Amino acid sequence: MAAISRAIKQELLEDLKPEMYLPPKSTRRRAKVKTEEKVDVKTLVKSKSKKRRAAKNELEENVEFVRRFAPRRPYQWRGRQVRALPRPGIPVVFTPGQRSGVASKRSYDEVYADEDVLDQSGNMINEFAYGKRVKMLTHKNPTPSQVPITPQEPIARPGEARLLPTVQVLAPRDSKHETMLPVTKSEGGDVKVENKGFEQITPQLGVQTVDIKVPVKRKSEVEDEILKRAKMEPFETTVKMEYSEQPQVEVFDTGVEPSSFFEVRSQARPIAVARKRRVPTVEVMEVQQSDHTAPTASAAPVANVIVGPHLSRRPSRWGPANAIYPDYVYHPSISAKKIMGPRPTGRVSRWGPANSIFPEVRLHPSMVSAVTRAAPRKSTKSRRRRRVRTRRAFVLPAGTKTGVMLPQNIRYHPSILFRRA
Protein backbone atom coordinates (compact mmCIF):
# COMPACT_ATOMS: atom_id res chain seq x y z
CA MET A 1 0.00 0.00 0.00
CA ALA A 2 2.85 2.26 0.88
CA ALA A 3 4.54 1.58 -2.46
CA ILE A 4 1.34 2.44 -4.41
CA SER A 5 0.79 5.68 -2.54
CA ARG A 6 4.43 6.63 -3.08
CA ALA A 7 4.12 6.03 -6.83
CA ILE A 8 0.95 8.14 -6.98
CA LYS A 9 2.63 10.97 -5.11
CA GLN A 10 5.62 10.86 -7.46
CA GLU A 11 3.38 10.98 -10.53
CA LEU A 12 1.44 13.94 -9.20
CA LEU A 13 4.69 15.71 -8.32
CA GLU A 14 6.04 15.29 -11.85
CA ASP A 15 2.94 16.90 -13.29
CA LEU A 16 3.02 19.81 -10.90
CA LYS A 17 6.81 20.40 -10.76
CA PRO A 18 8.51 18.67 -13.66
CA GLU A 19 12.28 18.18 -13.35
CA MET A 20 13.60 20.43 -16.14
CA TYR A 21 17.35 21.10 -16.09
CA LEU A 22 17.59 24.32 -18.12
CA PRO A 23 19.67 27.44 -17.50
CA PRO A 24 17.69 29.97 -15.54
CA LYS A 25 16.26 32.90 -17.39
CA SER A 26 18.29 36.04 -16.87
CA THR A 27 16.41 38.81 -15.19
CA ARG A 28 18.69 41.43 -16.71
CA ARG A 29 16.80 43.77 -18.95
CA ARG A 30 18.46 44.92 -22.12
CA ALA A 31 17.68 48.09 -23.89
CA LYS A 32 15.78 47.42 -27.07
CA VAL A 33 17.01 49.56 -29.90
CA LYS A 34 14.57 50.31 -32.62
CA THR A 35 16.17 51.15 -35.89
CA GLU A 36 14.47 52.98 -38.66
CA GLU A 37 15.75 53.31 -42.15
CA LYS A 38 16.51 56.65 -43.70
CA VAL A 39 16.16 58.49 -40.43
CA ASP A 40 18.96 60.92 -39.62
CA VAL A 41 18.45 60.72 -35.87
CA LYS A 42 21.01 59.50 -33.35
CA THR A 43 19.87 56.45 -31.42
CA LEU A 44 19.43 57.05 -27.75
CA VAL A 45 21.44 54.58 -25.61
CA LYS A 46 21.50 54.85 -21.85
CA SER A 47 24.83 55.27 -20.07
CA LYS A 48 24.22 52.15 -17.99
CA SER A 49 24.01 50.04 -21.12
CA LYS A 50 27.20 51.58 -22.45
CA LYS A 51 29.12 50.46 -19.37
CA ARG A 52 27.81 46.93 -19.65
CA ARG A 53 28.78 46.67 -23.32
CA ALA A 54 32.26 48.04 -22.66
CA ALA A 55 32.84 45.55 -19.85
CA LYS A 56 31.65 42.68 -22.02
CA ASN A 57 33.92 43.65 -24.91
CA GLU A 58 36.91 43.99 -22.57
CA LEU A 59 36.39 40.46 -21.20
CA GLU A 60 36.27 39.03 -24.69
CA GLU A 61 39.42 40.78 -25.83
CA ASN A 62 41.67 39.90 -22.85
CA VAL A 63 42.98 36.34 -22.49
CA GLU A 64 42.33 34.84 -19.08
CA PHE A 65 45.31 33.04 -17.45
CA VAL A 66 44.25 30.25 -15.18
CA ARG A 67 47.64 30.06 -13.37
CA ARG A 68 50.53 32.32 -14.22
CA PHE A 69 53.25 30.47 -12.21
CA ALA A 70 53.78 27.05 -10.70
CA PRO A 71 52.30 26.64 -7.23
CA ARG A 72 54.77 27.62 -4.52
CA ARG A 73 55.00 26.44 -0.93
CA PRO A 74 54.17 29.39 1.30
CA TYR A 75 56.99 30.32 3.69
CA GLN A 76 56.07 30.08 7.33
CA TRP A 77 57.09 33.43 8.78
CA ARG A 78 55.28 32.95 12.06
CA GLY A 79 57.69 31.96 14.79
CA ARG A 80 60.83 32.80 12.79
CA GLN A 81 63.47 34.93 14.47
CA VAL A 82 65.77 37.31 12.65
CA ARG A 83 69.40 37.27 13.80
CA ALA A 84 70.68 40.74 14.53
CA LEU A 85 74.05 41.51 12.92
CA PRO A 86 75.35 44.80 14.32
CA ARG A 87 77.71 46.87 12.23
CA PRO A 88 81.34 47.28 13.34
CA GLY A 89 81.73 49.86 16.07
CA ILE A 90 78.34 49.26 17.73
CA PRO A 91 78.81 48.09 21.35
CA VAL A 92 76.98 44.91 22.25
CA VAL A 93 75.54 45.20 25.76
CA PHE A 94 74.56 42.13 27.74
CA THR A 95 72.07 42.60 30.56
CA PRO A 96 71.77 39.56 32.86
CA GLY A 97 68.23 38.38 33.43
CA GLN A 98 66.81 40.31 30.49
CA ARG A 99 65.74 38.45 27.37
CA SER A 100 66.82 39.87 24.07
CA GLY A 101 63.90 40.71 21.85
CA VAL A 102 63.55 40.05 18.15
CA ALA A 103 65.40 42.28 15.75
CA SER A 104 63.61 45.52 15.15
CA LYS A 105 63.41 47.36 11.87
CA ARG A 106 66.51 49.03 10.58
CA SER A 107 67.11 52.57 11.58
CA TYR A 108 67.79 55.42 9.20
CA ASP A 109 71.57 55.19 9.70
CA GLU A 110 71.63 51.54 8.71
CA VAL A 111 69.57 51.96 5.58
CA TYR A 112 71.56 54.91 4.25
CA ALA A 113 75.34 54.83 4.39
CA ASP A 114 77.69 57.73 4.91
CA GLU A 115 78.36 60.15 2.10
CA ASP A 116 82.07 59.29 1.95
CA VAL A 117 81.65 55.52 2.23
CA LEU A 118 83.76 54.95 -0.89
CA ASP A 119 86.58 57.04 0.52
CA GLN A 120 86.39 55.10 3.78
CA SER A 121 86.69 51.79 1.93
CA GLY A 122 89.65 53.10 -0.05
CA ASN A 123 91.44 54.33 3.07
CA MET A 124 90.50 51.21 5.08
CA ILE A 125 89.03 53.14 8.02
CA ASN A 126 85.94 52.86 10.24
CA GLU A 127 83.94 49.77 9.29
CA PHE A 128 86.46 48.84 6.57
CA ALA A 129 89.42 48.70 8.96
CA TYR A 130 89.01 45.03 9.88
CA GLY A 131 87.82 41.91 8.14
CA LYS A 132 88.08 43.29 4.62
CA ARG A 133 90.35 41.88 1.92
CA VAL A 134 92.84 44.37 0.56
CA LYS A 135 92.42 45.18 -3.10
CA MET A 136 95.53 44.19 -5.05
CA LEU A 137 96.50 46.76 -7.65
CA THR A 138 98.99 44.55 -9.51
CA HIS A 139 100.11 40.92 -9.70
CA LYS A 140 103.29 41.52 -11.68
CA ASN A 141 106.22 39.13 -11.14
CA PRO A 142 109.53 40.79 -12.11
CA THR A 143 111.43 37.46 -12.06
CA PRO A 144 109.16 34.81 -13.61
CA SER A 145 111.98 32.37 -14.42
CA GLN A 146 113.39 32.34 -10.88
CA VAL A 147 112.28 30.26 -7.92
CA PRO A 148 113.03 31.17 -4.28
CA ILE A 149 115.60 29.14 -2.36
CA THR A 150 115.46 30.98 0.97
CA PRO A 151 112.43 32.59 2.61
CA GLN A 152 111.97 36.31 2.30
CA GLU A 153 113.22 37.66 5.61
CA PRO A 154 113.24 41.33 6.66
CA ILE A 155 116.45 43.10 7.64
CA ALA A 156 116.03 45.07 10.85
CA ARG A 157 117.77 48.41 10.57
CA PRO A 158 117.65 50.76 13.58
CA GLY A 159 116.38 54.25 13.01
CA GLU A 160 114.28 53.46 9.93
CA ALA A 161 110.79 52.48 10.97
CA ARG A 162 109.05 53.07 7.67
CA LEU A 163 111.47 51.32 5.32
CA LEU A 164 111.87 47.59 5.95
CA PRO A 165 114.07 45.95 3.30
CA THR A 166 113.89 42.21 2.76
CA VAL A 167 116.31 39.73 1.16
CA GLN A 168 115.50 36.55 -0.73
CA VAL A 169 117.82 34.32 -2.75
CA LEU A 170 116.46 33.12 -6.09
CA ALA A 171 117.75 30.46 -8.48
CA PRO A 172 116.85 29.47 -12.04
CA ARG A 173 113.79 27.27 -12.33
CA ASP A 174 115.68 24.60 -14.34
CA SER A 175 118.24 23.88 -11.61
CA LYS A 176 115.88 23.24 -8.72
CA HIS A 177 116.08 19.43 -9.09
CA GLU A 178 119.87 19.32 -9.36
CA THR A 179 122.19 18.52 -6.46
CA MET A 180 123.23 21.69 -4.67
CA LEU A 181 127.04 21.76 -4.99
CA PRO A 182 129.32 24.19 -3.13
CA VAL A 183 129.99 27.24 -5.24
CA THR A 184 132.27 30.23 -5.01
CA LYS A 185 131.67 33.85 -6.01
CA SER A 186 133.69 35.22 -8.87
CA GLU A 187 135.28 38.65 -9.01
CA GLY A 188 133.30 41.62 -7.83
CA GLY A 189 133.18 43.22 -11.25
CA ASP A 190 130.66 40.68 -12.59
CA VAL A 191 127.96 41.57 -10.03
CA LYS A 192 125.03 43.35 -11.68
CA VAL A 193 122.68 45.62 -9.73
CA GLU A 194 119.37 46.34 -11.44
CA ASN A 195 116.76 48.65 -9.98
CA LYS A 196 113.22 47.63 -10.97
CA GLY A 197 111.74 50.86 -9.66
CA PHE A 198 108.90 51.59 -7.29
CA GLU A 199 105.58 49.82 -7.77
CA GLN A 200 102.38 50.20 -5.76
CA ILE A 201 100.94 46.83 -4.74
CA THR A 202 98.07 47.93 -2.48
CA PRO A 203 96.64 51.37 -1.64
CA GLN A 204 98.93 51.49 1.42
CA LEU A 205 101.90 49.35 0.30
CA GLY A 206 104.60 50.08 -2.23
CA VAL A 207 107.52 47.85 -3.17
CA GLN A 208 110.83 48.80 -4.73
CA THR A 209 112.61 45.76 -6.20
CA VAL A 210 116.41 45.76 -6.55
CA ASP A 211 117.92 42.71 -8.29
CA ILE A 212 121.52 41.85 -7.47
CA LYS A 213 122.75 39.21 -9.93
CA VAL A 214 125.80 37.32 -8.67
CA PRO A 215 127.29 34.80 -11.14
CA VAL A 216 128.63 31.62 -9.53
CA LYS A 217 131.12 29.04 -10.71
CA ARG A 218 132.00 25.57 -9.52
CA LYS A 219 135.10 24.72 -7.53
CA SER A 220 138.25 23.14 -8.91
CA GLU A 221 138.38 19.72 -10.55
CA VAL A 222 140.02 18.12 -7.48
CA GLU A 223 137.07 19.05 -5.29
CA ASP A 224 134.68 17.80 -7.96
CA GLU A 225 136.44 14.44 -7.92
CA ILE A 226 136.12 14.22 -4.13
CA LEU A 227 132.41 15.00 -4.33
CA LYS A 228 131.91 12.47 -7.11
CA ARG A 229 133.76 9.77 -5.14
CA ALA A 230 131.71 10.51 -2.03
CA LYS A 231 128.55 10.25 -4.08
CA MET A 232 129.49 6.88 -5.59
CA GLU A 233 130.61 5.21 -2.33
CA PRO A 234 127.97 3.24 -0.42
CA PHE A 235 126.38 4.88 2.56
CA GLU A 236 127.61 3.68 5.96
CA THR A 237 126.10 4.38 9.33
CA THR A 238 128.30 6.34 11.72
CA VAL A 239 126.24 5.91 14.89
CA LYS A 240 125.42 2.50 16.32
CA MET A 241 123.26 1.79 19.37
CA GLU A 242 123.66 -1.52 21.17
CA TYR A 243 123.01 -3.06 24.58
CA SER A 244 125.90 -3.65 26.95
CA GLU A 245 124.24 -6.86 28.14
CA GLN A 246 121.52 -9.08 26.78
CA PRO A 247 118.01 -8.36 28.12
CA GLN A 248 116.35 -10.94 30.33
CA VAL A 249 113.51 -12.81 28.68
CA GLU A 250 111.12 -15.02 30.64
CA VAL A 251 108.57 -17.35 29.05
CA PHE A 252 105.34 -18.31 30.76
CA ASP A 253 102.99 -21.21 30.07
CA THR A 254 99.42 -21.86 31.16
CA GLY A 255 100.50 -22.62 34.73
CA VAL A 256 98.88 -26.06 34.88
CA GLU A 257 100.90 -29.23 35.09
CA PRO A 258 100.46 -31.71 32.23
CA SER A 259 98.00 -34.30 33.32
CA SER A 260 95.51 -36.68 31.85
CA PHE A 261 92.65 -35.05 30.05
CA PHE A 262 90.10 -37.04 32.01
CA GLU A 263 91.29 -35.87 35.44
CA VAL A 264 89.14 -33.37 37.24
CA ARG A 265 90.49 -29.82 36.86
CA SER A 266 90.37 -29.24 40.60
CA GLN A 267 92.98 -31.98 41.10
CA ALA A 268 95.53 -30.38 38.78
CA ARG A 269 98.06 -28.29 40.70
CA PRO A 270 98.35 -24.70 39.45
CA ILE A 271 101.78 -23.14 39.34
CA ALA A 272 102.48 -19.42 39.68
CA VAL A 273 105.69 -17.69 38.68
CA ALA A 274 106.76 -14.43 40.26
CA ARG A 275 108.19 -12.23 37.52
CA LYS A 276 111.62 -10.75 38.20
CA ARG A 277 112.11 -7.04 37.90
CA ARG A 278 114.32 -6.19 34.99
CA VAL A 279 117.40 -4.17 35.87
CA PRO A 280 117.68 -1.15 33.56
CA THR A 281 120.54 -1.78 31.19
CA VAL A 282 123.18 0.76 30.21
CA GLU A 283 123.15 1.67 26.55
CA VAL A 284 126.42 2.33 24.74
CA MET A 285 126.55 4.74 21.81
CA GLU A 286 129.46 4.00 19.49
CA VAL A 287 130.62 6.75 17.13
CA GLN A 288 132.73 5.75 14.14
CA GLN A 289 134.51 7.72 11.49
CA SER A 290 133.60 7.18 7.85
CA ASP A 291 136.15 5.42 5.60
CA HIS A 292 136.45 8.15 2.98
CA THR A 293 137.88 10.83 5.30
CA ALA A 294 141.22 12.53 4.76
CA PRO A 295 144.28 10.28 5.39
CA THR A 296 145.89 12.85 7.70
CA ALA A 297 143.04 12.73 10.21
CA SER A 298 143.57 10.19 13.01
CA ALA A 299 140.89 7.72 14.02
CA ALA A 300 138.68 9.16 16.74
CA PRO A 301 138.45 7.13 19.97
CA VAL A 302 135.23 5.36 20.79
CA ALA A 303 133.13 7.48 23.12
CA ASN A 304 130.96 5.75 25.68
CA VAL A 305 127.89 7.75 26.48
CA ILE A 306 125.87 6.54 29.46
CA VAL A 307 122.16 7.00 28.99
CA GLY A 308 119.93 7.28 32.05
CA PRO A 309 117.58 4.49 33.10
CA HIS A 310 114.57 4.02 30.87
CA LEU A 311 111.37 4.73 32.76
CA SER A 312 108.93 1.91 32.06
CA ARG A 313 105.80 0.47 33.58
CA ARG A 314 105.97 -1.92 36.49
CA PRO A 315 105.99 -5.49 35.14
CA SER A 316 102.88 -7.58 35.59
CA ARG A 317 102.81 -10.31 38.22
CA TRP A 318 101.48 -13.07 36.01
CA GLY A 319 103.46 -12.45 32.85
CA PRO A 320 102.36 -11.36 29.39
CA ALA A 321 98.88 -12.22 28.22
CA ASN A 322 100.11 -13.78 24.99
CA ALA A 323 101.70 -16.61 27.00
CA ILE A 324 98.26 -17.97 27.94
CA TYR A 325 97.63 -21.11 25.89
CA PRO A 326 94.08 -22.47 26.00
CA ASP A 327 93.39 -26.15 26.56
CA TYR A 328 92.36 -27.56 23.21
CA VAL A 329 91.76 -30.96 21.63
CA TYR A 330 92.39 -31.93 18.01
CA HIS A 331 89.87 -33.68 15.83
CA PRO A 332 90.53 -37.45 15.47
CA SER A 333 91.49 -36.86 11.82
CA ILE A 334 94.39 -34.58 12.90
CA SER A 335 97.55 -36.20 14.17
CA ALA A 336 99.72 -33.55 15.77
CA LYS A 337 101.46 -32.99 19.05
CA LYS A 338 99.89 -30.62 21.51
CA ILE A 339 101.72 -27.31 21.90
CA MET A 340 102.84 -26.85 25.47
CA GLY A 341 104.97 -23.97 26.72
CA PRO A 342 108.10 -24.57 28.78
CA ARG A 343 107.74 -25.29 32.45
CA PRO A 344 107.94 -22.14 34.59
CA THR A 345 110.56 -21.77 37.28
CA GLY A 346 110.49 -19.74 40.45
CA ARG A 347 108.28 -19.32 43.49
CA VAL A 348 105.00 -21.17 43.69
CA SER A 349 102.03 -19.03 44.66
CA ARG A 350 99.18 -20.23 46.81
CA TRP A 351 96.35 -19.54 44.38
CA GLY A 352 98.17 -19.90 41.08
CA PRO A 353 98.28 -17.46 38.18
CA ALA A 354 95.17 -16.01 36.67
CA ASN A 355 95.90 -17.72 33.37
CA SER A 356 95.38 -21.14 34.97
CA ILE A 357 91.63 -20.58 35.26
CA PHE A 358 90.11 -22.52 32.37
CA PRO A 359 86.65 -24.06 32.04
CA GLU A 360 86.28 -27.82 32.14
CA VAL A 361 86.21 -29.42 28.71
CA ARG A 362 84.15 -32.53 28.06
CA LEU A 363 84.33 -34.46 24.84
CA HIS A 364 81.71 -36.32 22.94
CA PRO A 365 82.10 -40.12 23.24
CA SER A 366 83.03 -40.30 19.55
CA MET A 367 86.23 -38.33 20.29
CA VAL A 368 87.31 -40.26 23.38
CA SER A 369 89.37 -42.85 21.51
CA ALA A 370 91.50 -40.17 19.83
CA VAL A 371 92.82 -38.74 23.11
CA THR A 372 95.84 -40.37 24.68
CA ARG A 373 97.41 -39.84 28.06
CA ALA A 374 100.30 -37.41 27.97
CA ALA A 375 103.65 -38.80 29.03
CA PRO A 376 104.78 -37.38 32.38
CA ARG A 377 107.64 -34.95 32.07
CA LYS A 378 110.77 -35.25 34.12
CA SER A 379 110.93 -32.57 36.74
CA THR A 380 114.09 -30.49 36.79
CA LYS A 381 113.47 -29.27 40.32
CA SER A 382 115.82 -30.34 43.07
CA ARG A 383 113.11 -30.14 45.73
CA ARG A 384 110.16 -32.50 45.55
CA ARG A 385 106.78 -31.98 47.08
CA ARG A 386 105.01 -34.85 48.74
CA ARG A 387 101.65 -35.57 47.18
CA VAL A 388 98.96 -37.24 49.25
CA ARG A 389 96.78 -39.52 47.17
CA THR A 390 93.35 -40.55 48.34
CA ARG A 391 91.58 -43.66 47.20
CA ARG A 392 88.79 -42.89 44.80
CA ALA A 393 85.31 -44.18 45.39
CA PHE A 394 84.32 -47.25 43.37
CA VAL A 395 82.00 -46.33 40.51
CA LEU A 396 80.39 -48.88 38.25
CA PRO A 397 81.58 -48.73 34.66
CA ALA A 398 79.16 -46.77 32.50
CA GLY A 399 78.40 -47.15 28.85
CA THR A 400 75.86 -46.13 26.27
CA LYS A 401 73.09 -48.31 25.00
CA THR A 402 75.10 -48.92 21.84
CA GLY A 403 77.94 -50.42 23.86
CA VAL A 404 80.46 -47.50 23.93
CA MET A 405 82.28 -47.32 27.28
CA LEU A 406 82.38 -43.91 28.93
CA PRO A 407 84.99 -42.46 31.34
CA GLN A 408 84.08 -42.73 34.99
CA ASN A 409 84.79 -39.18 36.14
CA ILE A 410 82.40 -37.46 33.71
CA ARG A 411 78.70 -37.17 34.46
CA TYR A 412 76.24 -37.70 31.64
CA HIS A 413 72.50 -37.47 31.43
CA PRO A 414 70.77 -40.64 32.70
CA SER A 415 68.97 -41.07 29.39
CA ILE A 416 72.20 -42.11 27.61
CA LEU A 417 73.73 -44.23 30.38
CA PHE A 418 73.50 -47.96 30.86
CA ARG A 419 75.09 -49.36 34.03
CA ARG A 420 75.44 -53.04 34.72
CA ALA A 421 74.38 -54.09 38.19
Swiss-Prot record:
Tell me a GO cellular component.
Answer: virion component
Q: Cross-referenced InterPro entries, in alphabetical order? A: Adeno_V (IPR005608)
Give a GO molecular function annotation for the protein: DNA binding
Induction pattern: Expressed in the late phase of the viral replicative cycle.
What are the BP-aspect GO terms? viral release from host cell
| Main localization category | virion
**Membrane-crossing residue ranges in chain numbering:** none
Q: Which UniProt keywords apply?
A: DNA-binding, Host nucleus, Late protein, Viral capsid assembly, Viral release from host cell, Virion
Q: Where located?
A: Virion; Host nucleus, Host nucleolus
Going by the entry's taxonomy, the superkingdom of the source organism is recorded as Viruses
Q: Which Pfam families match?
A: Adeno_PV
Something else the entry says is: All late proteins expressed from the major late promoter are produced by alternative splicing and alternative polyadenylation of the same gene giving rise to non-overlapping ORFs. A leader sequence is present in the N-terminus of all these mRNAs and is recognized by the viral shutoff protein to provide expression although conventional translation via ribosome scanning from the cap has been shut off in the host cell. This protein is only encoded by mastadenoviruses, and may therefore play a role in mammals tropism.
Subunit architecture? Monomer. Homodimer. Exists in equilibrium between monomers and dimers in solution. Interacts with the histone-like nucleoprotein; this interactions bridge the virus core to the capsid. Interacts with core protein X; this interactions bridge the virus core to the capsid. Interacts with the endosome lysis protein VI; this interactions bridge the virus core to the capsid. Interacts with the peripentonal hexons. Interacts with host NPM1; this interaction might play a role in virus assembly.
**Family in the record:** Belongs to the adenoviridae core-capsid bridging protein family.
Q: What's this chain's function?
A: Associates loosely with the viral DNA to form an outer shell around the nucleoprotein-DNA complex and links it with the capsid by binding the endosome lysis protein. Dissociates from the viral genome during entry. Might be involved in nuclear capsid assembly of the viral particles through its association with NPM1/nucleophosmin.
This protein is called Core-capsid bridging protein
The organism is: Canine adenovirus serotype 1 (strain RI261)
Q: Taxonomy-wise, where does this protein's organism fall, top ranks first?
A: Viruses, Varidnaviria, Bamfordvirae, Preplasmiviricota, Tectiliviricetes
Gene name, please?
L2
